[in-house]
Amino acid sequence: KGRNIIGWDEILEGGLAPNATVMSWRGVEGGITAAKAGHDAIMTPSPYAYLDQYQEEPETAPTTIGGYNTLKKTYSYNPVPDDAEELIKKHIIGVQGNIWNEYMQNDERRDYQAFPRAIALAETGWTQNSRKNWNSFRNRMIEDFERMDVINVKACRNFFDVNINTHVYDGTLKAVLETFYPDAEIRYTTDGSAPTAKSELYTQPFIWEGNIDLQAAAFKGGKMLGKVNGKKLYANLISGKRYTTTPHWGWMSGDIFGENDVLLSLIHISEP
């Protein structure tokens, strides 16, 4: 008596109690469905709000449960769709970040998983989507990192590094490099050597030939901001091609955890 129920969105499947609040984790649909039915909903979808997922290159990052959720992706989330009905807006009462600890042995590791993405999620919760600005946020993040350093929060520092991705443009597979640090230069090499302030300057996505060992870092004022990130990229006859048959569930598609609908490398082929 006098208590309210709150549960993950699976409780939608068994019929909701009149006072039930739904935590929408399997995407946003559960929260929308609950709100339409007049129930409060907390938006905590796995693709954006699970802070135990990878936030930097999985090959070199500490082991997590999986997924791939960057600082920028977390910040991009809009918990209340702009075109939502008033009833839905009324019943979406907030956002929630989740961390499951089975891969985290200590507080330092939990700091690494939570920050800085918890800051992005907090701003997402208290700022109207129309007023959010990624460039403003990442400029302010520089001071936030200074504050975290002072109070000994061991945040992930991928903000100062370069993210290496691949995407298909007009049927052609290209390498895409990005750093979250504002106004930084990206310098890279393709032979496995560490980039310097005089290495090739990244200006736009580029095509590569054969197999390369791509190494990249962010620089400002001639100084490297973070660490060097690397990825071996392979080019062969199937690179960038779309599926012609339904793939087996276990095949890896896209560049990271199946985010693109192209098959990059079932096998590595070094010759035609």
Feature-to-residue mapping (PLM):
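Conserved small/polar residues in nucleotide/adenosyl-binding loops
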Residues: 267-272
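Active-site neighborhood of glycoside hydrolase catalytic domains
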Residues: 1-20, 25-33
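Hydrophobic faces of well-ordered beta-strands that scaffold small-molecule active sites
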Residues: 5-7, 22-24, 41-44, 93-97
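Active-site beta-loop-alpha junctions enriched in small/polar residues
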Residues: 10-12, 25-27, 46-48, 98-102
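Polar, glycine-rich mid-to-C-terminal structural blocks
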Residues: 19-21, 32-42, 46-59, 63-66
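Acidic/polar loop patches that form or flank catalytic/metal-binding clefts of enzymes
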Residues: 2-9, 41-45, 128-134, 156, ...
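Substrate-binding clefts and catalytic carboxylate motifs of secreted carbohydrate-active enzymes
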Residues: 55-56, 60-172, 180-184
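Short, compositionally stereotyped local motifs that mark structural "simplifiers"
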Residues: 132, 138-266
